[in-house]
UniProtKB/Swiss-Prot annotation:
Gene Ontology annotations for the cellular component aspect, listed alphabetically: CCR4-NOT complex; CCR4-NOT core complex; mitochondrial outer membrane; mitochondrion
Swiss-Prot/TrEMBL keywords: Coiled coil, Membrane, Mitochondrion, Mitochondrion outer membrane, Repeat, WD repeat
Gene3D superfamilies the record matches: 6.10.280.220, YVTN repeat-like/Quinoprotein amine dehydrogenase
Name this polypeptide is given: Mitochondrial division protein 1
Organism (species): Pyricularia oryzae (strain 70-15 / ATCC MYA-4617 / FGSC 8958)
Repeat region (WD), residues: 317-358, 359-396, 437-476, 478-498, 499-541, 544-583, 585-620, 622-660
Bias (Low complexity): 154-165
Region (Disordered): 1-29, 135-170, 244-267, 275-294, 397-416
One MF term in the entry's GO annotations: GTPase binding
SMART domains to which the protein is assigned, alphabetical: WD40
RNA-binding among keywords: no
Stretches of the chain forming a coiled coil according to its record: 211-254
Places the protein is found: Mitochondrion outer membrane
Length: 661
């Protein structure tokens, strides 16, 4: 049973109560101090070092001194009849007391830190040296061999710690050996993965090669089927025309029979001689058929899957220098002309010659093929039109050898590397008509739709109507240059006689291109003139080249020109200024561009290619392979054409090379 003293230890006399309950007696304070000291010793004793328990006792003694102050007594024990033990338990838990005791470091403990005059490293530096992998520098160099070494030198070796240091070194050696072994295992695993990837890549290359062969076979079959379809369409067209003629003849015969009956009744209407002069329907010639424009229904995509600069085929086309060539589409129809006065038509898909075009009396200097319609301009001052769809050509078999066909071999392959003569008469039905109004050789031509323009050494440019087959306009270049000089008063449009790179054999009109009513022509004075065919006047003069212009081509924004001054210039058609320019080591003899590349023949055994997307120059042609294999260099490239990354180049020795670009 609790004594009266235990019931209220804060009173000096249990039977009496002080008038002011907030004032504590000395006896009560001593009892409270003992309880707080006992509680603190009980809670904090197990988690601290016994040697430091005196700190808490001295702390409680200091608390007792402060608690004796009257003001502090009033503020702390203002609540009536609340024991100190209940007050402490309601404010601080065991976990909170332990945390405060561990986290708070009093000043007297900090003052007792021993100082080592012989050690110049701080505690933090020692931590960094012991655990270098936790620092920023250690993280950057974690894979180095020295990552496990200490950054601080160990103290002097004594007999007591010598054994411990040796054990640490052995453990470190074992750890490093294990790590080295693991690195070797990982390296072997990485090598195995690389070998597996190489095997997969080789398998993928093999699969790609097989699929490319399948694609080539599909395109070959597609071309043959398309050729058969065009033949059937031509037969349907002919049958329909014959049916229409028969129907019109039948309709005309009925009224003629009636007229003959009436004439028998009226013998005096006309004499017999008059009737004999009336042409009959059978003798009336039918209207001439227009050239049938045949467009391909499919486009080849095989060349798009080859690496740029890959050689597709080489053709021994001619025995002399190639002067002009053009093709309509990738793996389509190629027409080539040379100094040997021959013009040949080639099937690029099979690599065989379809036939030769005969009619010109001199070599062809310019030509263009579009939708099976071919225009050729020759030194004989004539322009001839041809319909290549009328050629007698069977793409299924060989016309040259009578043996069994080998489907896997390249058709019409010549083992002696000599041009093979095509069958006679295969192109006999191709000529359409001849345009002969020029007085000198035709050096440039271009047609679009029903309009054809041709430039000649007679210093004129003529516009032709392909429907009527006649010349509709003649443009005098010298007269236009004189008119421009007079009207401008600056001499910018005048004929320039002192071009620095003027060549004696340069063509007066080097290149032309027409689109609707717009005409661009490049001449021997280095000028590029833009004409308006509706008025026959020069709309703008582009001055920049110092040599004869040999090639030009324009789209809706830019015009690209090549010249004997060894440069290619890109002009902005909106402002008439130079947008870009490239310089080469030799004169530019031929140039063409597609959506991505500008290709040019610049007096070398390779074709100069400029990639407009990547803005880089590179070479493509047989000269690269010959240089790598230390062989004799091939002939100089004279002509080059490109469409959709499919490039054809013609050389001085008559060989035609076909490349992906």
């Amino acid at each position: 049973m609790a004594s009266p003293e235990d019931e209220n230890p804060f009173q000096d006399d249990p039977g009496q109560e002080d008038e002011d309950g907030s004032i504590l007696s000395p006896r009560g304070l001593e009892a409270f101090s003992r309880k707080v000291t006992t509680t603190a010793s009980h809670l904090m004793g197990p988690v601290v070092d016994p040697s430091s328990s005196g700190h808490y006792q001295s702390a409680m003694t200091e608390v007792q001194k402060h608690l004796r102050r009257p003001n502090l007594q009033r503020s702390m024990f203002s609540m009536a009849r609340t024991t100190p033990s209940d007050l402490v338990r309601s404010k601080l838990s065991t976990r909170e007391i332990q945390h405060r005791a561990l986290a708070h470091v009093p000043d007297d403990m900090l003052a007792n830190i021993p100082e080592d005059d012989n050690n110049s490293y701080s505690l933090f530096q020692g931590f960094q040296a012991s655990f270098p992998e936790l620092t920023d520098e250690g993280k950057k160099h974690r894979r180095r061999v020295s990552r496990g070494r200490k950054l601080l030198d160990e103290g002097p070796t004594t007999p007591e710690n010598g054994t411990t240091g040796l054990q640490k070194l052995r453990k470190e050696r074992a750890s490093m050996s294990h790590e080295l072994e693991m690195l070797g295992i990982r390296k072997n695993m990485a090598s195995s993965e690389i070998r597996e990837i190489d095997i997969k890549i080789a398998n993928l290359h093999g699969m790609r090669r097989i699929i490319l062969e399948r694609l080539a076979a599909l395109e070959q079959e597609e071309t043959l089927l398309e050729h058969d379809l065009m033949e059937v369409e031509a037969r349907v067209e002919d049958a329909q025309m014959l049916a229409d003629e028969a129907e019109s003849t039948a309709q005309q015969s009925s009224p003629r029979d009636t007229d003959d009956a009436d004439a028998e009744d009226n013998d005096g209407f006309m004499s017999q001689s008059i009737y004999e002069k009336i042409p009959s329907a059978a003798s009336t010639p039918s209207k001439s058929r227009k050239p049938r424009i045949v467009r391909r229904k499919s486009m080849a995509v095989l060349h798009e899957h080859f690496e740029p600069g890959t050689s597709i085929r080489e053709l021994r086309a001619h025995q002399d220098c190639i002067t002009a060539m053009d093709f309509d589409a990738p793996f389509g129809t190629l027409v080539s002309a040379a100094m040997d006065d021959s013009v040949k038509v080639w099937d690029l898909n099979a690599g065989r010659c379809i036939g030769s075009l005969e009619g010109h009396t001199a070599s062809v200097r310019a030509l263009q093929v579009e939708d099976n319609i071919l225009a050729t301009g020759s030194r004989d001052a004539t322009v001839r039109l041809w319909d290549l769809s009328k050629a007698h050509y069977d793409p299924h078999g060989s016309h040259y050898n009578g043996g069994d066909d080998d489907d896997d071999a390249m058709a019409f392959e010549n083992p002696d590397d000599q041009p093979v003569d095509p069958p006679a008469g295969s192109m006999a039905d191709c000529p359409l008509f001849t345009l002969s109004s020029h007085m000198d050789e035709v050096t440039a031509l271009h047609f679009k739709g029903d309009t054809l323009v041709s430039g000649s050494s007679d210093k004129t440019i003529r516009q032709w109507d392909l429907v009527k087959g006649r010349c509709v306009q003649t443009l005098d270049v010298m007269w236009a240059a004189a008119q421009a000089s007079v009207s401008l008063g600056t001499g910018d449009g005048a004929w320039r006689q002192t071009a620095r790179s003027q060549a004696e054999d340069a063509d007066f009109v080097g290149a032309v291109q027409v689109f609707d009513a717009a005409l661009a022509c490049g001449t021997a004075d280095g000028m590029v003139r833009l004409w308006d065919l509706r008025s026959g006047q020069v709309h703008r003069n582009l001055v920049g080249h110092t040599g004869p212009v040999t090639a030009l081509q324009f789209d809706n924004m830019h015009l690209v020109t090549g010249s004997h001054d060894r440069s290619i210039r890109i002009w902005d058609l909106r402002t008439g200024s130079i947008f870009d320019a490239f310089a080469y080591d030799h004169p530019v003899t031929s140039m063409m561009f597609d959506a991505r590349r500008i290709v040019s023949a610049a007096g070398e055994d390779v074709v100069k290619v400029y990639d407009k997307v990547e803005s880089r120059q590179w070479d493509c042609g047989a000269g690269i392979k010959a240089a790598e294999e230390m062989k004799n260099p091939p002939a100089i490239v004279e002509r080059v054409r490109i469409r959709d990354g499919y490039m054809v180049e013609g050389r001085r020795d008559g060989i035609v090379g076909i490349w992906t670009c």
